[in-house]
Amino acid sequence: MESTEYAGLRVLIIDDFPNFRTALAKNMHTLGFRHINSVSSGSEALSICRKNHYDIIFSDYNLGNGKNGQQLLEEIRYLKLCKLSDLFVLISADTSRDVVMASYDCEPNDYLTKPITGKTLEQRIRRLLAKRQELSPVYTAIDDANLDKAIRLLEELLNANSRYSVDCQKLLGDLYLRQNKYELAEDLYKTVLSSRELDWAKVGLANVELAYGQYGIAASSLDVIIDDHPSYLKAYDSLSDACVSLGDNDRLQKVLEKAALASPMSIGRQKTLADICLVNGDVASAIKAYKKTIKYGANSHYDNVDNHLNLARAITKIYDEDVDAASGATLDAIHLLNNIDAKYEVSDAQKIQATLLNSQINALNGNKKVSSDLFNQAQKLMSQAEERDVEVEVEHVNALIAGGKNSEAKDVIDEMLIYYKNNQSALEKIDFLLEEPVSIKGKKIIGTINKKGIDYYKSKDFEKSIEYFHKAQKKYPRYIGLKLNFVQALISSIKDDGYNKDYIEKTRSTFKVIERYVSPKNDKYPRYKQLNSMFHQAAQQAEYQERTRINKEKQHD
């Protein structure tokens, strides 16, 4: 494409520095572009993109307050304000690893590092537009949802030995998978790999294995790819899909943690990590991931009220693990919930959830009057709701328990179990309120983990037993039987192996949680009292032995 042909193309430049906008516009004009607009912020860019179509968009990564370039690109695509053939070039003076990884992860058409010379700009523009011209019919077919036509065009380009054969192969493999042409995809990826060991082809082949239902094989393949190339983020995404298909939430969390470590500013993965941590009962990790989701997702299309509600929800769950540790996190949650409707448009259900969560946290933090007032507000809002919402009802029960109204909470739970008896999805949410799960999935999970914990306990492998009981009671924090199994394994380890500060502290904190739920009328109360007495004896003996050991060492020195 000659420079005279650039005159009809529209260009948008986004940068918060006027001098850079002017310099880049001047360079583009010199190259032959005549329709050039420039703005200083992401919000201005979105506004102008809603009104006009641009063939090329240049955006700085750091745009000051508001959206950054990565978030802008993601939102433009999310809102479908650009076509596949349009070019988005991300520019940055920040070459830190986190920024570069996040930038490449959102797949701009190119990435330029400041300062940019006129020669570099010209070379990149010519290369990008030449590729655009050759692949334009393919892009148009995809935009028109005519994927079979796009496949035919790509096959023709490959048969003609297109200079963009690698791009054609990558796109063709994706389209084969989307159109369920798995054998063709497999042949393509194997052909590519027979001549070059390319990461995208390896992941593509693993995606074929996923499509065939070979989840374990695919997961093993992807593990190898990640070990060899830990920065290739698409491998983590495919491995996450494999874990979901295998129903292995624990492994899924580990995969997402590695992905978040590789690219901390990848907002979507941080959110997915936070969600699965909450499902797994790993509330400390959930809180960290939700905070990062909120931090990095501010001003992006990932920024929504549910992230804040889930952060508050995770904070309330700390009380089911460690009462002492929970108090330090509550102030953030209260501030967040008090201001949530000032920033977002919240639905009626979200407003009720926020109020109930706020009531819980204030009750657990000792602010009984504030908690009661908030609870009454929520009750009024619930009475006006047109439809039932199981998530609202779960928080209603949690608020009752936090306020010491255990009898009322039990009545509400009993009614919920009757109403939702044929709704497994709802029952899975209710499981977290119960001493024992009632959903099919919950019973299966808890049965498997609990059995393993008991088997290890019987064989006196207390460390493994503790690991399994700890995992199970995090998933189902109100299951008192599990907590008692957990502390029994901890006590047995202390008695057999001696002083262990971590185990003693875990036992004490778990007993504090049990005390919130087990009254003298509870059938678990006698076992609780017996184990509590055993613990005090074991802890005193272990601490005495530890002091004696330390004193002997001092005398020896």
Residue ranges and their predicted role:
Residues Y6-N19, L24-M28:
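Conserved acidic segment of CheY-like receiver
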Residues F33-S41, I48:
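Short hydrophobic/Thr-rich beta-strand motif most characteristic of the beta2 strand and flanking loop
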Residues D60-I76, L84, S492, Y503:
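Conserved phosphotransfer microenvironments
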Residues Q70-Q71, L84, D94-D110, Q123:
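Alpha4 helix (beta4-alpha4-beta5 surface) of REC/receiver domains from two-component response regulators
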Residues I116-I125:
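C-terminal output helix
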Residues L129-K181:
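CheY-like receiver
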Residues E186-S407, D411-I413, S425-I430, K441-K458, ...:
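Flexible loop/N-cap segments at domain edges
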